[in-house]
Amino acid sequence: MIKLIVTKSEKVQDLFVSSVKKFSKMSGVCVLVAKPYSAVANKLKGSRILFIDTLSESEEENVIHVPPSNLTALSIAVNQALQSFEGKKFLVFDSFSTLTVRNPPKVVSKFALFLLERVRTWDVEAVIIVAKEGTDAELLAVLKQSADKVEER
């Protein structure tokens, strides 16, 4: 199932942390686009979580660095990370819309379609969080169409 959460920008990080904690019995991947690993490390601990950090090059064992401007590398990293886990898996993006800071919105929309199609094929539980303010209308429409459930908070 793919859940899209549309919220105020000041709520994004709290919703990200609470979303990840709901998957405490599963293995999964957290993609950090708005805050680096160091900002969430103390709030989210667990050997079954792999972080893809697009903002810093952390030396932690459970962290992979991918530049936010390289969506192909990000897609490959998500794919490989999810495939490394057995059983039920999850994927949580802390602020998907932030990808448009380093990439054109149309490119991010295509990336979203591709990635969410793959997530559905892999039977992964996914939570995509976007800030209401400043999110490209086309990207938001694509995310809403691709999601199984949309929550506005």
Give the role of each language-model region:
Residues V108-G134:
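Substrate-engagement module of ASCE P-loop NTPases
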Residues S9-Q13, P36-S38, S58, S97-P105, ...:
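Short acidic, S/G/P-rich loop/turn micro-motifs used as interaction or catalytic elements
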Residues V124-E125, A131-R153:
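Phosphate-binding/switch region of NTP-binding enzymes
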Residues Y37-P68:
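Nucleotide-state-sensitive switch-loop elements of NTP-binding domains
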Residues M1-N42:
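Glycine-rich P-loop/Walker A and Walker A-like loops and their local beta1-loop-alpha1 context
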Residues L4, F90-F93, V127:
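Structural motif
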Residues E59-F114:
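Phosphate-binding/switch loop-helix module in NTP-utilizing enzymes
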Residues S24, L44-S47, Q145-A147:
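Short, structured coil segments at secondary-structure junctions
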